[in-house]
């Protein structure tokens, strides 16, 4: 009877190891994405701060692909605020995803510990 238990534990450990490796990769990817979104948010904030120092009637050019479009200061300001808001929302989503992944790995580890304790009690 010891052999089936060992096979079952071995299978559980290999599944856990695969899950941990996969989760670590996903967490690293989420960290990179969060870092990039923080840079985007900071860049938009700094640009907006500089724009707000200009006179209200100032027209500006927005780079779109290989051309520039003439827009008002207010339109550019609104676009930058929207960009910051979207970045913040995506950061929150990624943080939630990251915490979920970490929780799921911890639960899998706890399940294996529980299985080991049950086997030792027998």
From Swiss-Prot:
CDD domains reported in the protein's UniProt record: Prefoldin_1
A cellular-component GO term for this protein: prefoldin complex
Keyword Chaperone among UniProt keywords: yes
Protein function: Binds specifically to cytosolic chaperonin (c-CPN) and transfers target proteins to it. Binds to nascent polypeptide chain and promotes folding in an environment in which there are many competing pathways for nonnative proteins.
Keywords, comma-separated and alphabetical: Acetylation, Chaperone
N-acetylalanine sites (modified residues): 2
Gene name per UniProt: PFDN1
Record family assignment: Belongs to the prefoldin subunit beta family.
UniProt protein name: Prefoldin subunit 1
InterPro entries: PFD_beta-like, Prefoldin
Gene Ontology MF term list: protein folding chaperone; unfolded protein binding
GO BP: protein folding
Species of the source: Bos taurus (Bovine)
Superkingdom per UniProt: Eukaryota
Subunit structure: Heterohexamer of two PFD-alpha type and four PFD-beta type subunits.
Keyword Lipid biosynthesis: no
